[in-house]
Amino acid sequence: MASKVVTGVVKTTAGGVVPVSQKYTVQSVGVWERIRRAFAIDPNRSNGVPLVPYNRNPSPGSLDPLAYDDPVTIPAGDIADNPYWKRDARRNYPRLSVVGQAEAVALLSVGSASHPRVELVGENGSKQLVAAQEAGKTGGLAKYFEGTGVEAGKLVLAETGGLPPLPSGEKLGEGGKWDVYKYQLAEEPSYSEAYPCRSFS
């Protein structure tokens, strides 16, 4: 048996052509096969489309769809309260925080985390915050400064010290105040003396 297989392989590699009828491909039949062989450059060349019942394992329709258990990964596979934008790691980049006029009016009137107003703690503070945001949406900062311009200016100067906002790279100092990060020269330079370049850390 093995010798016959080897002999067939040798004949094929030696120049013997396998006829189309022995190939496991879908071919035309009847008059269409004669037309194809008449116009084909190589009549023994198949079209390459495999016979589905013989060259598909498992064959189509052989598996019971109810017998297949779809693997579910938690929490990615849980569709309840799991939208794609929450688990999209590719677009999960830092976004800029924007403070509108309504939020600015609420911060000036109610207070912030750094300078909270003690009298507006609890439910009264939450109600006052909602009212301040609604007032900021309708009137904006201009309307707020018309009524309490001097007090708002004093509050802003007390929080910032009369200076503009600090640039990025600020850190909390030892005294509890925000300070810009101090750059220091590295003790071991990353470049040799042939390339005089200072490294900061």
Curated annotation (Swiss-Prot):
GO CC aspect terms: mitochondrial inner membrane
Catalytic activity: a ubiquinone + NADH + 5 H(+)(in) = a ubiquinol + NAD(+) + 4 H(+)(out)
Subunit annotation: Complex I is composed of about 40 different subunits.
Protein name: NADH-ubiquinone oxidoreductase 21.3 kDa subunit
InterPro entries recorded: NADH_Ub_cplx-1_21kDa (IPR016813)
Record function comment: Transfer of electrons from NADH to the respiratory chain. The immediate electron acceptor for the enzyme is believed to be ubiquinone.
Organism lineage: Eukaryota, Fungi, Dikarya, Ascomycota, Pezizomycotina
Enzyme kind, highest EC tier: translocase
The protein's Enzyme Commission number: 7.1.1.2
Subcellular location, record wording: Mitochondrion inner membrane
An example molecular function term from Gene Ontology annotations: NADH dehydrogenase (ubiquinone) activity
Keywords assigned: Membrane, Mitochondrion, Mitochondrion inner membrane, NAD, Oxidoreductase, Translocase, Ubiquinone
CDD domains, sorted: NuzM
